[in-house]
């Protein structure tokens, strides 16, 4: 029975690690999609005076479809990983070996922390993408209003020129901000990759510790004995010090 329950726990851990690896790859691709959307919208904004609006709209709609598809896939993976974590929690509550509960709870908490990090990263990237898309839609509407005004009036007066120059300044400011965001996202991708390597090393160390519980028990007994010996030695030193003081004052 113990072998069967242990096999069930290992199967759950295997499922959790597989889903975590899939989520890690999906989130990196999702972040790259957000970055490419920002860059393409900037390029489209710079050349929209010399080309029609057909190509940017097609590019935007294609990226929007990719965004929706990837968001659904990531949400499904998060839901599956949540279900696996819930099953692991049920197993730890029903496990009949008290000595293993601490190790199981530690492993479960680690998987929960990973799930929380992935969920937070997904919602943050999704919010950034939505903000960029909303801003680009707003700027596109402004450009259309300007072009409509120019074609309707046919007058290229000083006021319109100043307005267009101000609009160009805003576009340049947006481009600088987007480049800064791109650098930050690239840094985040590198940190995510390093976190994956550290997670793999930590997982292997926990696996070794769980496979050899006798080693953990022996280490704990050694630490307890060292602590006891330290207390005894401290007591002996204290008694000797008191006796020396009494002898010195007499």
UniProtKB/Swiss-Prot annotation:
GO molecular function, one term: SNAP receptor activity
Pfam (any one): V-SNARE_C
Induction entry: Expression induced by hydrogen peroxide in neuronal cells. By monocrotaline in pulmonary epithelial cells (at protein level). Negatively regulated by OSBPL7 via GABARAPL2 leading to degradation on proteasomes (at protein level).
Family matches, as InterPro entries: Golgi_SNAP_su1
Sequence segments annotated as region (Disordered): 38-59
Top-level taxonomic group: Eukaryota
Keywords annotated in UniProt: Acetylation, Coiled coil, ER-Golgi transport, Golgi apparatus, Membrane, Phosphoprotein, Protein transport, Transmembrane, Transmembrane helix, Transport
Coiled-coil spans in chain: 9-30, 68-95
Membrane-spanning parts: 230-250
Gene Ontology BP terms: endoplasmic reticulum to Golgi vesicle-mediated transport; inter-Golgi cisterna vesicle-mediated transport; intra-Golgi vesicle-mediated transport; protein transport; retrograde transport, endosome to Golgi; vesicle fusion
Residues exposed to the Cytoplasmic side: 2-229
Compartmental location: Golgi apparatus membrane
Residues bearing PTM N-acetylalanine: 2
Compositional bias per record (Basic and acidic residues), positions renumbered to this chain: 41-51
GO CC field: cis-Golgi network; cytosol; Golgi apparatus; Golgi medial cisterna; Golgi membrane; membrane; SNARE complex; transport vesicle
Topology relative to the membrane: Single-pass type IV membrane protein
Modified residue annotations for Phosphoserine: 141
Complex and partners: Component of several multiprotein Golgi SNARE complexes. Identified in a SNARE complex with BET1, STX5 and YKT6, in a SNARE complex with BET1L, STX5 and YKT6, in a SNARE complex with STX5, GOSR2, SEC22B and BET1, and in complex with STX5 and COG3. Interacts with GABARAPL2.
PANTHER family on file: GOLGI SNAP RECEPTOR COMPLEX MEMBER 1, GOS-28 SNARE- RELATED
Biological function: Involved in transport from the ER to the Golgi apparatus as well as in intra-Golgi transport. It belongs to a super-family of proteins called t-SNAREs or soluble NSF (N-ethylmaleimide-sensitive factor) attachment protein receptor. May play a protective role against hydrogen peroxide induced cytotoxicity under glutathione depleted conditions in neuronal cells by regulating the intracellular ROS levels via inhibition of p38 MAPK (MAPK11, MAPK12, MAPK13 and MAPK14). Participates in docking and fusion stage of ER to cis-Golgi transport.
Official protein name in the record: Golgi SNAP receptor complex member 1
